[in-house]
């Protein structure tokens, strides 16, 4: 897929560029990012250069991951990363993807991650035809869960022993979002609305 750019009131979500490597490297030195994400630790300059120069563009080209650099419209600084991952089921009857993100420490607490997530959700549902979006995080990642809840994800439970990190099995929280979950929010920049009905009929279990 050809990379796209999304714009919100305060942010630009654009493809990563080679010039982003220093900012990505600096952000990923903060311990919470490798602790709660798949970012390796220690995270070197070579890792950042490979991510922005190879991994991110290949994800768009191969339709395996759609990663956005989240940047401030005010000064161009890198706020974080956000994208759709695990896209193997996007072009199957399940029409499913997973939302992932991290935010640089100095930009947390300002609503940027929620604002960016709403733009990506809208794009996923409207333009990509996603019918079920999932959120996964290692159990205990309260910051990620707070963002997921704010954009409307329904918490579905805990996947026991689903993740192996540092040779230890760990639990994973899972949430889901359907197009029909989204309320209308006309006029708000970066809003997801109007919530479209699911394209494939949905028969929820009545029990």
Predicted regions and their residues:
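Short, P/G- and charge-enriched loop/turn segments at secondary-structure junctions
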Residues: 1-2, 55-58
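Acyl-donor (CoA/ACP) binding surface of acyl/acetyltransferases
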Residues: 1-34, 67-207
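Hydrophobic residues in alpha-helical segments
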Residues: 28, 37, 59-61
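Conserved GNAT-fold acetyl-CoA-binding loop/helix
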Residues: 34-54, 66-68
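Short, surface-exposed helix-loop/turn micro-motifs enriched in polar/charged residues
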Residues: 39-40, 62, 91
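Short helix-to-loop capping/linker segments positioned immediately adjacent to catalytic or ligand/cofactor-binding
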Residues: 57-59, 108-109
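Short loop/turn motifs at secondary-structure junctions and domain boundaries
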Residues: 58-63, 153
């Amino acid at each position: 897929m050809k990379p796209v750019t999304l714009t919100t009131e305060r942010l630009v979500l654009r493809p990563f560029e080679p010039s982003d490597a220093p900012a990505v490297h600096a952000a990923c030195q903060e311990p919470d990012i490798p602790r709660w994400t798949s970012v390796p630790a220690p995270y070197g300059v070579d890792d950042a250069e490979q991510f922005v120069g190879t991994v991110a563009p290949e994800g768009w080209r191969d339709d395996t991951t759609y990663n956005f650099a989240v940047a401030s419209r005010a000064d161009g600084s890198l706020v974080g990363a956000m994208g759709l991952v695990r896209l193997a089921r996007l072009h199957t009857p399940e029409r499913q993807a997973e939302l992932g993100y991290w935010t640089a420490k100095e930009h947390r607490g300002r609503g940027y991650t929620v604002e960016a997530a709403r733009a990506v959700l809208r794009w996923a549902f409207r333009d990509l035809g996603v019918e079920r979006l999932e959120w996964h995080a290692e159990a205990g990642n309260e910051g990620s869960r707070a963002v997921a809840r704010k954009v409307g994800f329904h918490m579905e439970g805990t996947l026991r022993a689903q993740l192996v990190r540092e040779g230890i099995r760990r639990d994973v929280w899972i949430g889901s979002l359907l197009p029909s979950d989204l309320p209308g929010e006309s006029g708000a920049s970066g809003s997801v609305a109007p919530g479209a009905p699911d394209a494939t009929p949905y028969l929820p279990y009545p029990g």
